[in-house]
């Protein structure tokens, strides 16, 4: 006859069974948690692994714009450099729509829009096959407009980031804001057009884990160039071009063009 516990009025065999069951449940819990965590980690790793470098469209117009745009931006900056040194605010303000038109043309003709399959954007028509809708459709135009809106929204945050890194706050506010607008238009607009609001893609971009291409290379080059452009400002050279933010803007444009060219050619597909 099994012994009965006078307090719980249950047999010792039942108590031992309950204890053994709870122990086995406790032991199995860490394993299940480890399985869930490993599944989550594998899912995030797979999402990063599927992020591929952006391929430029292979149409003749895309290849022409791809190579002509860096020369056009360089010519624009060199032609307006003296005026930029003399009066930076109106020069940056007047150049902003021109740069926006350049970037919009580059995105529409050269880059695949967010959500567009890469195979569809890069597929060449077969002999005798007519391409439907042309290269630019209503969806790509809407994507470009949304990318412009997102770039405008991010510009104030980029302005405050520049202030945190030492930009003038009480003075030269318009100078800094227009410089931030140029930097956002150069580096962030193509990324918004390509990736949209994909959280996994932006996590890879923000963590510098994305593969290098023209869009991500332009971002890295623009940031590094703007940072290096701040070096000559405090130096005692007494040059007119040391005014804020001439060297910052010069470094941003030069770094963006260099990073974009290298990211699209020599370092395409590589990671940090």
Curated annotation (Swiss-Prot):
Keyword terms, alphabetized: Endoplasmic reticulum, GPI-anchor biosynthesis, Membrane, Transmembrane, Transmembrane helix
Family from the record: Belongs to the PIGF family.
The species this protein was found in: Neurospora crassa (strain ATCC 24698 / 74-OR23-1A / CBS 708.71 / DSM 1257 / FGSC 987)
Biological-process GO terms, alphabetical: GPI anchor biosynthetic process
Name of the protein in question: Glycosylphosphatidylinositol anchor biosynthesis protein 11
Ranges annotated as biased composition (Low complexity): 32-48
Coiled-coil intervals: none
Subcellular location(s) of the protein: Endoplasmic reticulum membrane
